[in-house]
């Protein structure tokens, strides 16, 4: 059974609190991204590409038979791939209501809001808008 969103968020905050400096936190983020599976080539097309990201990001959402929203995404940039890993860990496999009612504030709590470049912040914002938009319209892609 999947952990609750609150447990996932608290575990992420705790994981990042173990690191004393941002070099170690970035390395952890990169390591998380490396563990993500590659999305199928059928989704590596312009129609699934996020706008607003400097790096290439493909983002897909599917609604399961159990009314859960499954997200898949990948980037060609290591840190962005790590950000994707965090987003998917919290939001993928959740109901629309869970997604809507869960703010991405945990990213601020681990300090990402002050340690990302402006272009990465824009990309993170684009991902946040995308999963919220897809959830709101309950799109099956």
Predicted regions and their residues:
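Conserved interaction-surface patches within small, structured recognition/assembly domains
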Residues: 62-77, 88-92
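Primarily the active-site beta-strand->alpha-helix module of PP2C/PPM metal-dependent phosphatases
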Residues: 84
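N-terminal intrinsically disordered, cationic/polar leader segments
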Residues: 2-5, 9, 19-27, 31-54, ...
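Glycine-rich phosphate/pyrophosphate-binding loops
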Residues: 93-110
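A glycine-rich, hydrophobic loop/mini-helix early in the fold
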Residues: 58
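Long, amphipathic alpha-helical surface segments
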Residues: 124-134
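Solvent-exposed interaction patches of small proteins and small membrane subunits
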Residues: 47-53, 71-75, 97-99
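Single conserved hydrophobic/aromatic residue that forms the stacking wall/gate
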Residues: 133-141
């Amino acid at each position: 059974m999947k952990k609750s969103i609150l447990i996932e968020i608290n575990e992420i905050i705790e994981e990042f609190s173990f690191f004393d400096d941002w070099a170690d936190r970035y390395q952890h983020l990169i390591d998380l991204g490396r563990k993500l599976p590659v999305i199928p080539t059928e989704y590596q097309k312009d129609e699934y590409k996020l706008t607003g990201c400097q790096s290439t990001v493909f983002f897909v959402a599917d609604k399961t038979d159990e009314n859960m929203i499954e997200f898949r995404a990948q980037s060609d940039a290591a840190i962005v791939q790590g950000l994707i890993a965090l987003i998917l860990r919290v939001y993928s496999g959740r109901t629309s209501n869970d997604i809507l009612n869960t703010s991405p504030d945990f990213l601020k709590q681990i300090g990402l809001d002050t340690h990302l470049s402006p272009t990465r912040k824009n990309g993170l914002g684009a991902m946040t808008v995308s999963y919220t938009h897809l959830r709101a319209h309950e799109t099956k892609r």
